[in-house]
């Protein structure tokens, strides 16, 4: 029996997918628990319209992500930090510091969780940091750490 899933179902599919399910499983579990709707002509038409809307939204999100990627890659973030002997930093520069500097210096709002660093920055110099803008879209940001 063809059904359109309204929720994620283990070993069957994700919400919004049209799948073939065994008749008994669909009638006794999926439909009564509102995990799926039967794939009638009317429901298929509604499902196709929703899929078209989702694809349009996805294209718009990708377009915005690419614009943000361009902005990030065309900017440099300069962070001033206190240093001790041998130009070693007191503390370190974290993704939160980079997020704050991006917002203050360029007005770009990027979540600190999307800024990927192998380790915190602990010395002066220029560093490249990866910013995950969208799934499969990454931007390279140049971070310049200078002493006070």
Swiss-Prot record:
Record-stated family: Belongs to the bacterial ribosomal protein bL9 family.
Keyword match Hydrolase: no
NCBIfam families linked to this entry: L9
MF terms in GO: rRNA binding; structural constituent of ribosome
One cellular-component annotation, GO: ribosome
SUPFAM superfamilies in the record: L9 N-domain-like, Ribosomal protein L9 C-domain
Signal peptide feature range: none
Keyword line: Ribonucleoprotein, Ribosomal protein, RNA-binding, rRNA-binding
InterPro entries attached to this UniProt entry: Ribosomal_bL9, Ribosomal_bL9/RNase_H1_N, Ribosomal_bL9_bac/chp, Ribosomal_bL9_C, Ribosomal_bL9_C_sf, Ribosomal_bL9_N, Ribosomal_bL9_N_sf
Biological role: Binds to the 23S rRNA.
Any one GO biological process: translation
Keyword Metal-binding attributed: no
Name of the featured protein: Large ribosomal subunit protein bL9
Xref: Pfam families: Ribosomal_L9_C, Ribosomal_L9_N
